Amino acid sequence: MDQPRRWAVEVVPGADRDRLCPLPRHDVVPSRSIPPTALAIAQAIRRVRTSARCGAAEHRDLFADPAWDMLLDLYVAEATGRRVSVSDACIAAAVPQATALRWLNMLDQRGLVIRTADQTDRRRWWMTLSDAGVALVERMLPPTMT
């Protein structure tokens, strides 16, 4: 049986409200082998995009693509063994839920994500990147040094 999830409140300066964020779990196993350098780059990009949305208003449009936010979140989640529900993916997009769901449908239609029904809760669906989704994110990351 899964251990209960621990949560912390993340205070985001300039945001309309604080967010509940899951604390890292050390008992999870990554579902895909992602190079550590690529993971570090993806995590850094995600942090920059999150903080930039809260920053200067004149530059917010540079960080406004919800599809990229969802793809990055799913990429990092797979590398760290974290499961992502549809609701989690919508939160990662930082847009209204209806907008995020439209983007998820588009990503699904393009074969970049895979939706899997939760075996214990028929209301919940899990999201993962398809092989094509992983390849797209890795193509978009800056070249890594080995």
Name each model feature, range by range.
Residues 42-72:
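Short alpha-helical segments that sit at the start of domains
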Residues 118-139:
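Short, cationic-aromatic polyanion-contact patches
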Residues 108-118:
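A short, conserved structural fragment
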Residues 1-32:
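DNA-contacting interfaces and partner/effector-binding or oligomerization modules
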Residues 73-77:
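Short amphipathic alpha-helical elements of helix-turn-helix/winged-helix folds
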Residues 89, 100, 104-110:
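Basic amphipathic alpha-helical segments that dock to polyanions
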Residues 139-146:
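Amphipathic alpha-helical dimerization/coiled-coil segments
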Residues 80-92:
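Short acidic, hydrophobic short linear motifs in intrinsically disordered regions
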